[in-house]
């Protein structure tokens, strides 16, 4: 049996459960439970994705969330020397996220959810502050929006049509 290149890449992805919620509906025979899960997938080298899923069983919700996360992978190419190239402030619904580059040896200074996202993205040195909403989904969306808005020095020079020696 041979593995394709695509499935080999999929095997390198690590999956983490960010949030699990249990909802209950009261029916004639008692309570009926359903679950939702927010799942994060990454390889620590710039590939990252998140997925949200609902199901009647917890394991099904986690499995479906992982599948959704693998379908929505993004690639962050502007990670220079383990940090981000510039500061970024992002608004997503009610959540605000501030990411600042840090010197080598600083580590990841951030809240637990944002720290997990940045670790799985492969960022080594960064300072992050989450402002506003504490809703996990909004914080995850804000983090992804911030990471996608990063541009390297080379990209900025190309946009400005400036040559650099």
Swiss-Prot record:
This is Small ribosomal subunit protein uS5. Belongs to the universal ribosomal protein uS5 family. NCBIfam families: rpsE_bact (TIGR01021). Coiled coil: none annotated. The keyword ATP-binding does not apply. The N-terminal domain interacts with the head of the 30S subunit; the C-terminal domain interacts with the body and contacts protein S4. The interaction surface between S4 and S5 is involved in control of translational fidelity. Residues 13-76 form the S5 DRBM domain. Keywords: Ribonucleoprotein, Ribosomal protein, RNA-binding, rRNA-binding. It comes from the Bacteria. Part of the 30S ribosomal subunit. Contacts proteins S4 and S8. One of its GO terms (biological process) is translation. The keyword rRNA-binding applies. One of its GO terms (molecular function) is rRNA binding. GO terms for cellular component: small ribosomal subunit. With S4 and S12 plays an important role in translational accuracy. Located at the back of the 30S subunit body where it stabilizes the conformation of the head with respect to the body.
